[in-house]
């Protein structure tokens, strides 16, 4: 990742500064209006937007929660430790974690040099990616089930693709586009996500796909 972009993402946010100043927990009002800790797309995405990004909040334990949108977590530098179904899932630099709307997870405190991006995505954003990836393969079918299912079952996918240069370049392009906010690039970003899906299909040997309540791989492909 370009140093200038990484430096931009490393800047301490107002929320993080309050934590450093002594606020010991996440301010849930920034994320949800309800009693149940479900992060709300209405608070995270501007009206009419299908996708947005924000840096993961460091220096604090992020308590168990889920989202009413799709979350894709990408670690730019360092690592991030999630707890899903009682199991530690460590995401290292260059890796991706897809979480559907029903997956509850908590995140252990990240340090200053642990830089992660949360992609907050409404399901319809993936329509172009579905078209590009097709449906005649196991991974594409699994992605469809994870990302668009009506059944309230938490699932996640962990892609260890730090060495796949094409995926890293595409992710950097999309992060830059969303961070700078230059123009309405929904279509470009949807197509970029479609290309990422295509490369993920070529990289299934690096994928771990699990149900949070199971400790074994749900499916293994090489």
Report residues per predicted region:
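His/acidic/aromatic-lined binding-pocket segments of jelly-roll/cupin-type domains
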Residues: 63-66, 70-75, 88-90, 96-97, ...
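Generic protein-terminus/edge-of-domain signal
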Residues: 1-79, 137-141
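Short histidine-centered beta-strand/loop micro-motifs
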Residues: 60-67, 108-110, 130, 185
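Short, Lys/Arg-enriched, Trp-marked, Pro/Gly-tolerant hinge/linker segments that flank
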Residues: 156-161, 178-191, 198-222
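Histidine-centered metal-chelating micro-motifs
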Residues: 79-81, 97, 101-106, 125-127
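Short acidic-glycine-tyrosine-enriched beta hairpin
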Residues: 86-101, 109-111, 115
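Amphipathic, well-ordered alpha-helical segments in soluble domains
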Residues: 71, 166-173, 192, 199
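A hydrophobic/aromatic-rich effector-binding and dimerization subdomain
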Residues: 2-21, 40-42, 50, 110-176
């Amino acid at each position: 990742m370009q140093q200038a972009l990484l430096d931009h993402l490393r800047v301490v946010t107002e929320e993080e500064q309050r934590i450093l100043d002594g606020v010991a927990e996440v301010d849930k009002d920034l994320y949800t209006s309800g009693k149940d800790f479900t992060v709300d797309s209405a608070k995270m995405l501007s009206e009419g937007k299908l996708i947005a990004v924000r840096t993961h909040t460091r220096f604090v334990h992020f308590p168990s929660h889920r989202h009413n949108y799709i979350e894709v977590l990408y670690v730019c530098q360092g690592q991030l430790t999630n707890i899903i179904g009682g199991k530690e899932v460590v995401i290292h630099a260059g890796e991706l974690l897809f979480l559907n709307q029903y997956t509850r997870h908590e995140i252990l405190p990240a340090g200053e040099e642990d830089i992660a991006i949360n992609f907050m995505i409404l399901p319809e954003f993936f329509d172009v990616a579905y078209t590009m990836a097709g449906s005649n393969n196991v991974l594409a079918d699994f992605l469809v089930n994870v990302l668009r299912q009506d059944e309230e079952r938490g699932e996640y996918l962990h892609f260890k693709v730090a060495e796949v240069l094409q995926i890293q370049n595409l992710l950097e392009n999309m992060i830059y586009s969303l961070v700078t906010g230059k123009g309405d690039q929904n279509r470009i970003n949807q197509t970029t996500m479609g290309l990422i899906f295509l490369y993920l299909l070529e990289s299934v040997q690096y994928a771990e796909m699990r149900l949070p309540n199971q400790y074994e791989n749900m499916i293994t492909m090489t």
